[in-house]
Amino acid sequence: MRTPEEQIRYAASITPSPRQLAWQQLEFYAFTHFGMNTFTNREWGDGTEDPALFNPDALDADQWVAAVKSAGMKALILTCKHHDGFCLWPSAYTEHSVKNSPWKNGQGDVVREVSDACRRGGIKFGVYLSPWDRHDARYGQGKPYDDYFVSQLTELATNYGDIFCVWFDGACGEGKNGKKQIYDWERYYAVLRKLQPNAVLNVCGPDVRWCGNEAGHCRKAEWSVVPAELRDAERTASKSQQADDGEFSRKIDSQDEDIGSREVIRNARELVWYPSEVDTSIRTGWFYHPEEDTDVRTADELLDIYLDAVGANASLLLNIPPDTHGRIAAPDCASLTELGTKIQQIFASNVTEKAAITADSAIAQHPITQAVDGMANTYWQAAYGQESDTITLKFPKPQKVSCVVLGEHLPTGQRIESGEIWADGSKVSEFTVVGHKRICRFAPVEVLTLTIKITASRTEPTLRLLAVYQ
């Protein structure tokens, strides 16, 4: 058993894999729930749907990508197969797919069109493949179904270029035979590690965890270093993509928000890097429903979610469901475009370089100037033995500021536990963990001296990013 001091140093030594680090840098990306449910006006299909129902008359994947990019998103994940088992690509392993639909006379491939559009648009492409299949008779029979599922994973992982993410839902209901399948997760992971080694495996995967709700909220202190047991994703199967029953959409409260504090990790034998993804939808449902056209989240609502997630060491996965024509609906596009504008406005005026910056301590190789040089691989580190520090920015004349953005150097671990921001002797903001990014917004103030106090850290704090905005 480690001593408390040894345990904290152990926690500070846990670092992300290259694939996790690349994923974290995306920050904000899209989910597109599209498939048979779009045409039946349901959220969950039962697998008995006729492929003839799938017939978008104006599918435009480039329009999807343009809508995604208008909000500043950098990737898109497509629901290639939802629980109903209908496949958006002409899989060789089932007849329940687009090849038996009237769309493009059975010659179409939604996965191909979307993956190609993502590459044309300069964003990354990912896939969602539900392991629960309410159509296929092999579901619930063990290895025969696993063979089928792995065959489909292999098709997606080999025929559509690089995939940045494979998103696994934890839903596990009954199949046609009334049985549930025991998923062979380790086999699925092994196939994907071989075929797409750079892809993160999310939610029911070992790389990225679910935040615990689909309301768009994350914890006050969202640690990426957590006990290894969380990788089991036990809550996902019972809570992921459920009906909005109040429990599903509530904000996380103090009783279950602590998953990485000193107290929680004190006796953990193994700690892992398992960062958080916040997933939510621009609409009430995950699939498109025409009656929800008047209930699209506003840009202001989406901005609050963005700042609460991306600004608190999580990434944001925002669902935007295409309609029955195969296009992103006009109300959704309008909210996304306005959201992108609002995000740009917040970060339009970086005034950091106007200030002279100092830190109470630093090691020689990593001075405080490396936190503000705009380089991804340089960083400030406090002197050895320091578990708190103060950074001071002095402006030559009063400067209006309203936002400070901080980011740790994750290849050396997540360390900062808490801090404060002071403007000319008055505290204007407090923060908990920093991790990849902490966005601190406060009422605009005019300031000569801005002070950032790191009040607690697991060993010496680091910052690769420090930016002050007007």
Predicted regions and their residues:
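Edge beta-strands of jelly-roll/beta-sandwich modules across compartments, strongly enriched
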Residues: 458-470
